[in-house]
Amino acid sequence: VIFSNLFHHILIRYKIHLKVSIDGAEETHNRNRKWVDGGGSYANIIDNCMYFKEYENQTKQSIQAAHVVTQNNYGETFRSVCHLVENLNFKVVDSSIDVVHRWTIDQLDGLADEWEKVLCYYIKRQKVGKAFLWGPVLDLKKYGENNGKSGFCGVGLIQIYVKVDGRIFGCAANLESSGCIGDVENGLSMDRIKRLRKLEEEGTMCSKCNLYRECQ
């Protein structure tokens, strides 16, 4: 996002919760986060840091780093989280796994090692009074509070996922056409939302999900 003073004022005035898509240090981030001309977007995020700080100071809300772990950057997961916390001062890092592509067992094993490093880092910073919030830990806590039931994320109710092509999805775990609920030009489609709410269509990504019975 290219910030303007008006846009920044609106975010602060209405205390809109803000997430910044950033996957780590410059080389890691620019590997997947590119503009249409092929250039990476990391420098643009850094240019907006002064706006981020003012937003947090005035709203008393922390900006979240939306950190996506993919097949070509999972080996840098630990270093990326450290960079976001220590160098860019994010207090909330929402790490999520790219579920669009099928992962191999070896890749998942490697990711598990990185996940463990981040968890140890999370615990260590808590002990020394420099805690940050890490998305996977928050998700596990909420999952336990709901007695193992899902639905706490409020997909389609309090959050949506917008792809770079403008299509809107209710759940980041279903980015197939069956999960599309509208687009930025025409808005949300109530027909599509109602169809997803019924969850009656067989063979869709949603119907195959083992948590869909509790999905909001």
Predicted feature residues:
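Short, small/polar residue-rich loop motifs at catalytic or cofactor-binding pockets
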Residues: 153-157
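Flexible glycine/acidic-rich beta-alpha junction loops that bind and position SAM and/or redox cofactors
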Residues: 27-32, 91-111, 132-147, 175-180
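C-terminal accessory region of radical SAM enzymes
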Residues: 113-144, 168, 172-216
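Short, solvent-exposed loop/turn segments at secondary-structure junctions
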Residues: 2, 25, 70-72, 99-102, ...
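Radical SAM/AdoMet-radical enzyme domain recognition
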Residues: 1-97
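Short, acidic, Ser/Thr-enriched surface-loop or helix-capping motifs
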Residues: 163
